[in-house]
Amino acid sequence: MQVTIECQKRPEGSKPNTLRRQGLIPAALYGHKGTESISLIIKEKDAQLLLKKASVNNTLVDVNIPDVPWSGKALIREVQTHPWKRFVYHLSFFSVAAHGKIDVVVPLNLVGESSGVKQGGIIEQVITEISVQCLPESIPETIEIDISPLKIGDSISVGDLQLSEGVTYLDDPTQTILTVMAPKKGSATEEETAEASA
């Protein structure tokens, strides 16, 4: 997915609350020259649109800064929001243009219908995303898990995942992702089965 954000260099001495009243969101870009950072501002409406398309620590974003001699791709590292209102207070980007492999978080997507579920079992999913390491151009949008073969009592762990070439998981390989649990005694499914066999 191609995602772009237009930024400007933040004026020196500008106050965050003053910028927000003007419809501008303070932001920072890290890693473009080692540890050096650039203070930026982004239009609030552009920031809201960006967050609808991009995910934190997952989506590569083309960051355009017309008044700075830099252009490249970055990850959204952090989004600061108002404690109870839905206002974005600050965005942090991390440049990946000059880096090798990076650590990102990728959501897990279950596909298929488990044979265990067809028998009345229940999918109990413990984690919905994992941390992986890969090159910026190899970041997967999601990792699909085919649950079709799973019977009641079967489970899938991080180490069971089939990842693309060049993508490695960072989480504990023994970490359980999901388990097909047997239906609880007296559940509607068991009662229906008993009635059908009566």
Curated annotation (Swiss-Prot):
GO molecular function (one): structural constituent of ribosome
UniProt xrefs under Pfam families: Ribosomal_L25p, Ribosomal_TL5_C
SUPFAM superfamilies linked to this entry: Ribosomal protein L25-like
GO cellular component terms attached to this protein's record: cytosolic large ribosomal subunit
RNA-binding as UniProt keyword: yes
Biological-process GO terms, alphabetical: translation
Keywords for this protein: Ribonucleoprotein, Ribosomal protein, RNA-binding, rRNA-binding
InterPro entries, A to Z: Rbsml_bL25/Gln-tRNA_synth_N, Ribosomal_bL25/Gln-tRNA_synth, Ribosomal_bL25_b-dom, Ribosomal_bL25_C, Ribosomal_bL25_long, Ribosomal_L25_dom, Ribosomal_uL5_bac-type
Record carries keyword rRNA-binding: yes
Function: This is one of the proteins that binds to the 5S RNA in the ribosome where it forms part of the central protuberance.
Subunit structure: Part of the 50S ribosomal subunit; part of the 5S rRNA/L5/L18/L25 subcomplex. Contacts the 5S rRNA. Binds to the 5S rRNA independently of L5 and L18.
Family per similarity comment: Belongs to the bacterial ribosomal protein bL25 family. CTC subfamily.
Protein name, UniProt field: Large ribosomal subunit protein bL25
Taxonomic source organism: Gloeothece citriformis (strain PCC 7424) (Cyanothece sp. (strain PCC 7424))
Gene from which this protein is expressed: rplY
